[in-house]
Each structure stands twice: as C-alpha cells, then as structure tokens.
Amino acid sequence: NGFPDVESAAEEILLISIQDYNTKQIRTWGLGQFNNKQDNVIYKGFNTEYELLLSFINWWMIEDNTPEVITGWNSELYDIPYLVRRLDRILGEKLMRRMSPWGLVTEREIYIAGRKNISYDIGGVTQLDYLNLYKKFTYKAQESYRLDYIASVELDQKKLDHSEFDTFKDFYTKGWQKFV
C-alpha cells in the first residue's frame, strides 16, 4: 500500500510536519531542499535522516515546543510508532525518550481483528487519533476509513493528486516540491 511497515521501521523518514493550531504556523523538517513560498511555513532541509531527526528532537525537547496534545489520522498505530522506532534506531533510546517531557515512552501491543499493532504512550503528551475518534463518534459505518475516502465523504475534498507519478517512490524522488 506504499506505507512502510511500523514493526521493522526500516525506511527513512522523509518529512516531519507540525502545525500549531493557535498560530497556524507549520514547521517542517525534510530530507532535501524545498522552495518554500508560504509565509506560515518554516522548512528546514537536511542531507541525512540523522540530521533531520536530531534537529526535530532538539526542537521538540524545548519545553515551550513540546505539545500537550498531538493529533493525526491513524497516528496512534502508524505515525507515532514509526517516528518513535526511527528515533530509537537512529538516535538511540535516550533521545527517543525525549518525546516525553518526563522521559516516559512506553510501547503497547494492541490487537485489532486478531492483528498485532504497536502503539506508544508518551507521558505528558495526549494523543488524539482522528481515525479512532471518527469511528467512535460517528454512527454510520463507512465502506473505508482511509483518510482520502473520509475526506471525500465528509468534506467533499480529496488528498493531493499525484497520479502523474507511477509509484509513491517516484512521487517523492521526482516530485519533491509537490510531495512536501
């Protein structure tokens, strides 16, 4: 499906983006250069994943930067576990634990339909997974819970079209500007 496996977390992280919903400012760390044309975006480009992750965790560990709440679609079972595992693999456990203001990052196994999933509790940071919230608080089952499908049903919007690229890898290697 184009997404790297969470358990092995074998693929490099290419981008990390965070939006402050109070200021609307977006901060992005990327594995490559980007021609930023938006006033509300701060983009930092890096040559290696190590540099990207180190810059990110150094920013995150500053008390005023560590969010009280993080949100995302399927972030509990994908984004956060993948990020935590890559931080641990590339920077080591000590820096990975800085995701928590208290140094408390705990792995959990969650079984859904008999399939093992990995999740992490980050002490001091509340995680709100929009996929879980959507399933819990909407009373109509959907044929799919892919973000693109739900955005279409609920907002009449689609994710960014990248059909001009044959593969997802082509998208981020040949269309970096659009990918970011």
Residue map of PLM features:
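Non-catalytic, well-ordered alpha-helical scaffold segments
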Residues: E11-I13, P81, L128, Y145-D148
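Entry/capping segment at the start of metal-dependent catalytic domains
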Residues: N1-S17
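Residue-level signal for well-ordered alpha-helical scaffold segments within enzymatic catalytic domains
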Residues: N1, S17, S55-W59, Y82-R85, ...
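C-terminal or mid-to-C-terminal helical accessory/interaction module adjacent to the motor/catalytic core
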Residues: F137, Q142-E143, L147-F179
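Active-site-adjacent structural elements in folded domains
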Residues: G2-F3, L52, T173
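Conserved DEDDh/DEDDy metal-dependent 3′-5′ exonuclease domain
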Residues: G32-A141
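Short acidic-glycine loop/turn motifs at beta-strand connectors
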Residues: D20-K24
